[in-house]
Amino acid sequence: YYLGDLNETHFKQSKPLGGISFRKNFDRRFAFKSSLIYSMLYAHDKNSSNAEHVNRNLHFRNYIIDLSGQIEFNFLPYEIGNPKYTWTPFVFTGVSIFNHNPETENDNGEWIALQPLGTEGQGTPFYNGRKKYALTQFCLPFGGGMKIAINKDLNMIFEYGIRKTFTDYIDDVSTTYVGVDYAAQEFTSESIHLNDRSLDGPKMQGDDRGNRLTKDWYSFSSLTLSFKLNNKEKGCNPSN
């Protein structure tokens, strides 16, 4: 799930993910993990408990590809194949690079990429300070979970992790409306409609569309079956 202008509640509007990971245990306390995760983030204002957000009537989906490197710390000694050290809670942090491309569904049922449209005036002469956001960016992952050794070669890992991003455009919503009069000069008719879908009619230029003071976050929870192969651990992540 994601946290931002269209969703302010943890675990709400969650979607499945899939991925693969590689883990190198340095000792019983520390490990390095790299992972590749693919997921879809989604939110719709109609699911909000905030009446202003419901009236804003925006929604998006965003397919995320997340490549991460992390350092894990085990609170208890942990070693697969050693009956003395069969479970531990752990925490992790690291760095990720992710690719994203927010889309919205138009009235014809087609999903339209939002970044090229500059829905808040990005890349237009009137809003010189608003540049089009990058579709590949860095973020900071951190979280924790539990490791349980099933046998000498297999373990099960549950983890919850959240990503702190440095963009407010996971959902393509951040600042203000451009206004109908200005939009008519710069945008196609579809761009104008996707910029402002308010139920009570078009907003004025400068009206708040999102909260520019906060950045977006996204989060994963996963259950991993990890196995040893040639003294290395590899895993496959099903999730909810």
Report the location of each language-model feature:
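Short glycine/proline- and aromatic-enriched beta-strand/turn motifs that initiate or cap beta-hairpins
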Residues: 1-23, 102, 216-222, 226-232
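Outer-membrane beta-barrel proteins
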Residues: 2-8, 42-47, 80, 100-105, ...
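Extracellular loop and loop/strand-boundary signature of outer-membrane beta-barrel proteins
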Residues: 2-9, 52-60, 78, 126-132, ...
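Residues that define the transmembrane beta-barrel architecture of outer-membrane proteins
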Residues: 12-16, 63-67, 87, 136-140, ...
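Residues on the lipid-exposed face of transmembrane beta-strands in outer-membrane beta-barrel proteins
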Residues: 20-24, 67-75, 93-95, 142-148, ...
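Repeated loop/turn-to-beta-strand initiation elements of outer-membrane beta-barrel proteins
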Residues: 29-32, 79, 152-156, 232-234
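Outer-membrane beta-barrel transmembrane domain signature
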Residues: 96-214
